[in-house]
Swiss-Prot record:
Subcellular location: Cytoplasm
GO MF term list: glutamate-5-semialdehyde dehydrogenase activity; NADP binding
Pathway assignment: Amino-acid biosynthesis; L-proline biosynthesis; L-glutamate 5-semialdehyde from L-glutamate: step 2/2
Native source organism of the sequence: Bacillus cereus (strain 03BB102)
Group of enzyme by EC: oxidoreductase
Family annotation (NCBIfam families): PRK00197.1, proA
This protein's name: Gamma-glutamyl phosphate reductase
Name of encoding gene: proA
Entry's EC annotation: 1.2.1.41
Primary location: cytoplasm
BP GO annotations: L-proline biosynthetic process
Role played: Catalyzes the NADPH-dependent reduction of L-glutamate 5-phosphate into L-glutamate 5-semialdehyde and phosphate. The product spontaneously undergoes cyclization to form 1-pyrroline-5-carboxylate.
Cited CDD domains: ALDH_F18-19_ProA-GPR
Bilayer-spanning residue ranges: none
């Protein structure tokens, strides 16, 4: 039996053990992981540096290197996320609803773990910690399959997690990493129906599309973030500037950063040139339609592909429109149903935007950068779902549970 199947089989066995663990036992394991990550920070950073140096030698982009990079502060942030997770209510065993039938049967709908979660993801080693700890908190076994670019960091983090779990009542194999990063191992994971209850892809559009297209196991789709901000005619100038600059430049390599600004022509006539200048001073490359080019000749003419692209860098597309209806049509055509924002003082337009735009998170007068489990108060998240079944938006603890019905009687038979 090869590595992937062997780990799948073991995960299925471990999941049956995890469902018996109490909240306190799971929280003790999480606390041990948080402590161990701090104790072994130097080891993790050493392995991360090894991966970064290999990435530079291979010519990785700055945005990819940023996603791969770990620092002492990022590891501290991971542990803070775990501590927040410990404080969150455990959804497992929670009664979702309860009622009694006329025949005396008492019916309860209860939350239960999904079982075995497969996680396939690119670049970010912090996902290794997020996925492992959220799965443990919800009583799920997890099989992790990261990318070759992050293999050194991922192996180090999982080794640290195993050393932490060894001191607790949870099996070390509750968290397993597939070290084979070839396409063959991914394809096996896609079809491991006997062992996986759900597969969650987290990464770029190509990875997600491949998983959705090829997997036979149930998939929780975490879509790419082709996010937009629409600046309505009535938008406050300073607010619009602040939100656009934050949503694009604070951390351009993440999925909740914006990739296109849609400007109402009347607002752009007054403030567009100044906005473009402000963005360019911050290193942003602008790609716009003909109307944008007429305002600023340094803007590159946007191609059809640009409207579809999640740049994950300091590149921003610019679209000018004459109405909110045109803005909504553009966003619904090219958006990835992740996060979309409107900056406006017109409540009627805001309401129209909220009703008409199809996305997991919609914002009024705020940056899209808040689409995040911790910012929503969920603690660490396992991803941001852009699909409509099971769960949508940042996936916190309840997203990694299912339900079952528990029926109590006193001898009832069906007539």
């Amino acid at each position: 039996m090869n590595e992937v199947l062997a780990k799948g089989k073991r995960a299925k066995e471990v999941a049956m053990n995890l469902v018996l663990k109490s909240t306190s036992q799971k929280n003790e394991a999480l606390a041990a992981i948080a402590e161990r990550l701090i104790v072994e920070t130097a080891y993790i950073l050493e392995e991360n540096k090894r991966g970064i140096e290999e990435g530079k030698a291979k010519g990785f982009s700055d945005s990819l290197l940023d996603r791969l990079m770990l620092t002492e502060q990022r590891i501290v942030d991971m542990t803070e996320g775990i501590k927040q997770l410990i404080e969150l209510r455990d959804p497992v065993g929670e009664c979702v609803s309860a009622w009694e039938r006329p025949n005396g049967l008492s019916i309860q709908e209860m939350r239960v773990p999904l079982g075995v979660v497969g996680m396939i993801y690119e670049a970010r080693p912090n996902v290794t910690v997020d996925a492992a700890t959220i799965c443990l908190k919800t009583g799920n076994a997890v099989i992790l399959r990261g990318s070759s670019s992050a293999i050194h960091s991922n192996k180090a983090i999982v080794a640290v997690i195993h050393r932490a779990l060894k001191q607790t009542s949870l099996p070390q194999e509750s968290v397993q990493l597939i070290e084979d990063t070839t396409r063959d191992s991914a394809k096996q994971l896609f079809t491991m129906n006997d062992y996986l209850d759900v597969l969650i892809p987290r990464g770029g559009k190509q990875l997600i599309d491949t998983v959705v297209r090829e997997a036979s196991v149930p998939v929780l789709e975490t879509g790419a973030g082709n996010c937009h901000v629409f600046i309505d005619e009535t938008a406050d100038k300073q607010m619009a500037f602040d939100i656009i600059i934050n949503a694009k430049t604070q951390r351009p390599s993440v999925c909740n950063a914006i990739e296109t600004i849609v400007l109402h022509e009347k607002w752009a006539e007054q403030y567009g040139s100044e906005l473009f200048s402000s963005l360019k001073k911050r290193g942003v490359e602008l790609r716009g339609d003909q109307k944008a080019l007429a305002m600023d000749s340094s803007i590159v003419l946007a191609s059809e592909e640009d409207w579809w692209t999640e740049f994950l860098s300091l590149t921003l597309a610019v679209k000018l429109v004459s109405s909110i209806e045109e803005a909504i049509h553009h966003i619904n055509t090219y958006g990835s149903m992740h996060s979309e924002a409107i900056i406006s003082e017109n409540e009627e337009n805001v309401s129209k935007f909220f009703v008409s735009v199809d996305a997991a998170a919609l914002y009024h007068n705020a940056s899209t950068r808040f689409t995040d489990g911790s910012e929503f108060g969920f603690g660490a998240e396992i991803g941001i779902s852009t699909q409509k079944l099971h769960v949508r938006g940042p996936m916190g603890l309840p997203a990694l549970t299912s339900t079952k019905y528990v029926i109590r009687g006193n001898g009832q038979i069906r007539k």
